[in-house]
Amino acid sequence: MKRIIIYIAMLGMLCSCVDEEQYSDSPRGNFEALWRIFDEHYCFFSYKKAEYGLDWDAVYQKYSPQFSDKMTNAQMFEVMANMLSELRDGHVNIYSTFDVARNWSWHEDYPQNYSDSLMRIYMGTDYKIAAGLEYRTLDDNIGFVRYSSFSNGIGEGNLDAVLSELATCNGLIIDIRNNSGGNLTNAEQLAARFTNKEILVGYIQHKTGRGHDDFSAMEEQRLKPSNGMRWQKPVVVLTNRTVFSAANEFVKYMKCCPNVTIVGDKTGGGAGMPFSSELPCGWAVRFSACPMYDRNKQPTEFGIEPDHNVAITTADFLDGKDTIIEFARTLFK
């Protein structure tokens, strides 16, 4: 059986590119090139049309009159950024020499549900560090692991050490709030510690043509158990809206594992494998090209719901308590 998309080295980076027709290096030429790149290669048109009425042809008609040969580069960049914001996709960017166009509404329009100051209270100063993981035992004998970015590498030895250290705990909390993604291999590697058998965790498709719905058949994503130490006790994964991309995939995997509960806010999503291209002016463009789904073949582009939706309350915050962590601790009693 295949490992989970072993050919993806990094979800959230420029991981492939496409060849494009030749357009002139003018505001009009760059606009036409940009619109065409997305028209032929972006993967969520039909899904987002159903979700909120996205019409890419209407987007063309809306923005085309705004481009003229008298525009400055800054003006061209601004209009292009506004056009791409219609896609509501955190994996969509334009990289110029002076700015990066991005859409962060997937977390900026929602409560943060995370606090660095509260995290310092829970972690203290005597926590341990194993590569990208910070961990300790809380005073009620619950193991606590903080993983802030899947860009931070972890090795099998690191995971063995952490799980061995926390082996006598009654349960385990994995806090990935504010983790906006990184290396998908790290997400798979960590999730593999929480299943004793190979399991189906989702599906992926690939673009096969230039039509909006030209895709391959769905291919299975399967998670194999680690050959190292595996955790057999209850696990709670903490999430908020800033959980995105590879971190969103990790939540998808963990929802398929036994004894796992997701607590916090809906994740930010980001379920398209990003590809890249280039405009005539030399600016790089990134976009979602390969859609990924959960094990029920449902899109996770706009996020994954937790098992328990919990938010940090003002009263708890002022009292030095993280409502989400405190709720998670009650699940082990």
PLM feature spans:
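Bacterial Sec-dependent N-terminal signal peptides
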Residues: 1-24
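Flexible loop residues that form catalytic
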Residues: 9, 177, 243
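Alpha-helix termination/capping residues and helix-transition junctions
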Residues: 11, 166-168, 229
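Flexible, low-complexity junctional segments that flank or bridge functional domains
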Residues: 17-206, 212-220, 234, 276
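C-terminal "post-core" interaction segments
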Residues: 18-39, 74, 141, 180-333
